[in-house]
Amino acid sequence: MSKPFSWFTKITGFIPQLFYLRRKTIYVNKEIQNRKIKEPAVIISNHTDLFDFGVYMFTFFNATICPLVAEITYDKNKIMTFLMKHWGAVRVDRDSYDFSFMSELIEKLDTGNSILIFPEGRIPEKDEGLLPFKPSFIYVAKEANVPIIPTYTTGEYGSGKTRVVIGEKIYVNDLYDKNLSEKENINNICLYFENYVKKLGEIANEEKK
């Protein structure tokens, strides 16, 4: 991501986001993880809307965040492609078996950026809950030796009622069980984070009552 372009976006978009992306930020443990990201990290979240990236860009204002973006969004039109390139987005084709995007994500982390991944892989339909997580974010965080920051957004953009919940940062290696195979560990850790994000959603919904 071009840091000058990132800051240009944040400065020019700061006032508009106060209205459309207005939100309340909730912390699981503010001492462990707050809105300031002190080291490169993998941010994961449920997926509600194309504006999810925007809300995290302004929530973690100090960080340079590069999102993982599906081909249907990245290639939507020339303007979108231009923005995605300058925001440092990594394109992934969900219908192919090309995993080179993971190397690109690791490179982003190695150069001091944070990355944003939506492990559901797509935006759920209205009648669907949180979709099963895909494990690519675990491989990336493990290889780059960076923490994962689980988050949740209610996605009620434009209403002023959005809630963003920030969980504690977690290192993948801290969740490994030496008695299990690599595949078993990855599956268990993926389910762990899926359930963690669900709990963040419960916190967000409880806060709305």
Residue ranges and their predicted role:
Residues 22, 62-64, 86, 112, ...:
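A generic structural signal for alpha->beta connector loops
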Residues 9, 75-79, 159:
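Short, glycine/polar-rich helix-capping loops at beta-to-alpha or helix-loop-helix junctions
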